[in-house]
Each structure stands twice: as structure tokens, then as C-alpha cells.
Amino acid sequence: MRTIEIFDTTLRDGEQSPGVNISTNEKVEIALQLEKLGVNRMEAGFAAASPGDQKSVAEVAKRVKNATVVSLARAVKDDMDKAYEALRNAQNASLHVFLATSPIHRQFKLNMSKEEVLARAVEAVTYAKKYFTEVQFSAEDAARTEIDFLAEVVEAVIKAGATTVNIPDTVGYMTPYQYGNIFRELKKRVPSTDLIRLSCHCHDDLGMAVANSLAAVEGGATQVEGTINGIGERAGNAALEEVALALETRKDYYQATTKLNLKEIARTSQLVSRLTGMIVPGNKAVVGANAFAHESGIHQDGVLKEVTTYEIIRPESVGFKSNKLVLGKHSGRHAFKEKLVDLGYHLEQEEVNAAFAAFKVLCDKKKEITDDDILALVDSKMVRGPEAFQLESVQLAYGNISVPTASVRLVRADGSVCEEAACGNGSVDSIYKAIDRATGEEVSLVDYKILSVTHGQDALGEVFVRLQQDDLIVTGRGVSTDVLEASAIAYVRAVNKIMERRGEPTPVSATI
């Protein structure tokens, strides 16, 4: 039975989803959960893309102990130097260097010949080996590269010292048979691939990223790259939870499995969804709300008699459990801290204190506190560091024959207070117009979503907003038992992100 290694790129490729902006602290929290999930490698970012990215990579590198932390880099010395600086304190570090190899990229993007591409690839890997024991080389758009030339590049970079070679389907163009065959051909043409990791990286433009990844495993790949929930640029990446469950459930066929702690999948999926603002569809395989639901009477009858009649995966095997009551208003700080550890959080004492204070406020509003309530509450408090504005209060005058009017009171970072009021086309619109007046920011609301965290009239409401200002798109999230307050919190946080990132240089984007 082969063991397939898992390379997670949620923090790099996943963050390139439109509108997704994850703060450094949020990246660290996701990284620690990925470590708990058991991924072999995690790509913390693209250190040379921006100062913010370099800081995020460095922070993740400091905190993660049991997985290899990776930074992406172009085949450029300055990129590799910055990656080395960011990863200097990592327990286990690796560089992921990439260069396009396909005819269309050579002609229109690089303006380089085959010989020049080959020489640049070897030069980059050779330079990277000065810094890193473990170096991964990706042949960008490998799936559309001539197989003879691809084999030549793979052989050359292995000889130069690459310990992993990645064969990405950069634009999600391949079919499973075609993609698997690339790996079979490389194994046949380049014997030295037996000495290194052969990795696959699939995009989902035609909806075949997971199928292609599994085909690569059949063809000889020993590492699968992807993201949690399949998030990523355009249509996204291969969903790692689907790949892992497919290998585990059908190991009789694939004769391969991973070393992931599958019971951490649900928690990891929920954390990534909350912090990115990307809602998991109900019918999403493995982690969707309906993944284990049965509505058909025939199916229900079968499941009641014998679960395996219609369930090939048990919800408990991926970490879903009954939403039992866990804490209440009489629960103490110690019990609350133990619950946070049980739920996978890694918080400093100051952060525990802040979360506990918010928990006590919630207990006064809600009779029954569940795991999901605590997850939503703590995740919503993960905005750390100074914010330009904080919401102190929101009031609304509303009736079916009057124009909705909202007034908001915001506190600036320096402690000063600003109050504004506005009328709007509905309660939420009036709140947002009042916040615009108070902050002085001109933004466009691109998307607004509201979810119920749990059930019942006193359930927490979770609001996600997406705002745009010029070319900058950000997300904000708010949680409260009052959905209008949650809406205001989400909007203010998104405005803060815009103000924080407006002066930053535009990050370099990279699609492998």
C-alpha cells in the first residue's frame, strides 16, 4: 500500500480566490489546523509577492513544527532570496520554484526558446539548493507541454537537485486519462523520477481536478497538491478532502492512502470557510451540509435498517458529530479554555480572555451554547491588532410605512468617536450608508450573505460581505444574535481591510 503525501496550498493558491484576503493571524490559525489535519507540506504564501505575504510566510514558519512550510518563488534570484529570509526560522522549510514550459507560455509570456527555458530551470534549482535541502520545481502548464521536452526538463532539474517535481494542469484542461498518462510516460522516460517525489497539481476549470489528481496517483504520482474546500483562482483547485476520502474509501482500488487525520476534515473545512468567507455548498462532497442527508423515503428506510445501504462514508469519520450542548452561563474560564483546545484553537491568554468575555455576553442572549456557536464566536474575534474603526452601537428606526433610518456610532483607533445617520432602501442599506458617512469611504457592496450558525429563534447569525473599491476587493464577516448588528460588524471590518490594504503594493499573482 503506497502512502501519498499531501501538499496544501490553501494559504497561497486558495487565497487567490477573488475577494479572499486572509490576514496574517488568520493564516497562522489555518496553518496550525492544517498541521493538526496532518498535511505533509503547506505552502504558506509567495514571499516575494508583497511585504504582507513575506510577513505571513515568516509567521507561519515560526509557528508550525510538524509539517514542512513552503514558499513559492519564480525562477528569479530575488524571489528565492526573499523566500529564504521568510523561511529562516522554520523547523522544516522548502522552496517551490516554478517556470512555464508549454509552447504558448514560451512564446507569449516568456519569449524564450526551449533551450533558454531548460537553462533557466536548471539555474534556478541550482541556486535554490544553496539555501534549501528540499526544493520543488514546477513546470507551469506542464499538461500542455510537449512530452519530449517535459521529460527533458524533469530529468535536468532532478540532476540539478530538485527533490520534488510538480506536473501541474495549470488551466484545468486535461482529462483523467490524458493527465494520468503524462505521469506514466515520465516514469518510463525518466528513471530518476523513482528517486524523488512526483507531484500533481490540478485546477477545476472543467470540473475534473479531483478525478485528474486520482488519475495521477494511478499513473505514479506520490504527492497530491490542492486546497481545502477546493478554493482557488477561477474555478478552484482539487479539493484535498475529496482526494483523501476517495483514496481512503477506495484503497482497495488505488492501493494508496494518505496519513491525514481524517477526523479533522470537518473542522478544517469550517475554519477555512469562515475565515475566507467562501461558503461551502450544501451538496459539496464530504463536507457539505447535505453530504450525509437522506430525504428519499426508500433511502431513509434503508439507512435506518443498515447504514451502509446508502452511506459509503460515516460522518463521524471526517469529524462531524452531534451538536450537543457544551457550555452555559455557569461555565468557568478553565472549562471554556479546555473547550477551545478541544475545538482546535491555539490562542494566547489575552485572546482567550477576550473570547471568554464575548462568550459570557452570548450566554446572556442565548440559552443553549453549542460547539458551532463557539466556533463562530471565536473565529469572529480573530481580528487582532489595531483597526481603523470599531462598531460601538447601531440603532434603527423602521416601519412598513416609514423610510428606514439607521444611526451608527464608531470608535476610531485613537479613541475618538464618530456618529452618523442615514436613510436607505431597507434596514441593511441604511446601516451601510451610515457607515459610509462615518468612515468617509466610498465602496461598492458586491456580495452579501447571511447564514444561521445554529437553529432556533436565538441562533447566531453569520454575515459575509464583499466590498470593492477600485480594483481592491475584500471580505468582511460579522457574528451576532442580531443579524443587523452582524451585518454592521461585517461591513465595518471589510472597510477596515480596504483602508489597511489600499496603500500596499499590488501583490504579484502566480498560478501554477
Curated annotation (Swiss-Prot):
<dbReference type="InterPro" id="IPR054691">
    <property type="entry name" value="LeuA/HCS_post-cat"/>
</dbReference>
<dbReference type="Pfam" id="PF22617">
    <property type="entry name" value="HCS_D2"/>
</dbReference>
<dbReference type="GO" id="GO:0030145">
    <property type="term" value="F:manganese ion binding"/>
</dbReference>
<dbReference type="InterPro" id="IPR050073">
    <property type="entry name" value="2-IPM_HCS-like"/>
</dbReference>
<feature type="binding site">
    <location>
        <position position="201"/>
    </location>
    <ligand>
        <name>Mn(2+)</name>
    </ligand>
</feature>
<keyword id="KW-0464">Manganese</keyword>
<protein>
    <recommendedName>
        <fullName>2-isopropylmalate synthase</fullName>
        <ecNumber>2.3.3.13</ecNumber>
    </recommendedName>
</protein>
<dbReference type="InterPro" id="IPR005671">
    <property type="entry name" value="LeuA_bact_synth"/>
</dbReference>
<dbReference type="Pfam" id="PF08502">
    <property type="entry name" value="LeuA_dimer"/>
</dbReference>
<dbReference type="GO" id="GO:0003852">
    <property type="term" value="F:2-isopropylmalate synthase activity"/>
</dbReference>
<comment type="similarity">
    <text>Belongs to the alpha-IPM synthase/homocitrate synthase family. LeuA type 1 subfamily.</text>
</comment>
<comment type="subunit">
    <text>Homodimer.</text>
</comment>
<comment type="pathway">
    <text>Amino-acid biosynthesis; L-leucine biosynthesis; L-leucine from 3-methyl-2-oxobutanoate: step 1/4.</text>
</comment>
<keyword id="KW-0963">Cytoplasm</keyword>
<comment type="function">
    <text>Catalyzes the condensation of the acetyl group of acetyl-CoA with 3-methyl-2-oxobutanoate (2-ketoisovalerate) to form 3-carboxy-3-hydroxy-4-methylpentanoate (2-isopropylmalate).</text>
</comment>
<dbReference type="InterPro" id="IPR002034">
    <property type="entry name" value="AIPM/Hcit_synth_CS"/>
</dbReference>
<feature type="domain" description="Pyruvate carboxyltransferase">
    <location>
        <begin position="4"/>
        <end position="266"/>
    </location>
</feature>
<keyword id="KW-0808">Transferase</keyword>
<dbReference type="InterPro" id="IPR013785">
    <property type="entry name" value="Aldolase_TIM"/>
</dbReference>
<dbReference type="InterPro" id="IPR036230">
    <property type="entry name" value="LeuA_allosteric_dom_sf"/>
</dbReference>
<dbReference type="GO" id="GO:0003985">
    <property type="term" value="F:acetyl-CoA C-acetyltransferase activity"/>
</dbReference>
<keyword id="KW-0479">Metal-binding</keyword>
<keyword id="KW-0028">Amino-acid biosynthesis</keyword>
<dbReference type="InterPro" id="IPR000891">
    <property type="entry name" value="PYR_CT"/>
</dbReference>
<keyword id="KW-0100">Branched-chain amino acid biosynthesis</keyword>
<dbReference type="GO" id="GO:0009098">
    <property type="term" value="P:L-leucine biosynthetic process"/>
</dbReference>
<feature type="binding site">
    <location>
        <position position="13"/>
    </location>
    <ligand>
        <name>Mn(2+)</name>
    </ligand>
</feature>
<dbReference type="GO" id="GO:0005737">
    <property type="term" value="C:cytoplasm"/>
</dbReference>
<keyword id="KW-0432">Leucine biosynthesis</keyword>
<feature type="region of interest" description="Regulatory domain">
    <location>
        <begin position="390"/>
        <end position="512"/>
    </location>
</feature>
<feature type="binding site">
    <location>
        <position position="237"/>
    </location>
    <ligand>
        <name>Mn(2+)</name>
    </ligand>
</feature>
<feature type="binding site">
    <location>
        <position position="203"/>
    </location>
    <ligand>
        <name>Mn(2+)</name>
    </ligand>
</feature>
<dbReference type="Pfam" id="PF00682">
    <property type="entry name" value="HMGL-like"/>
</dbReference>
<dbReference type="InterPro" id="IPR013709">
    <property type="entry name" value="2-isopropylmalate_synth_dimer"/>
</dbReference>
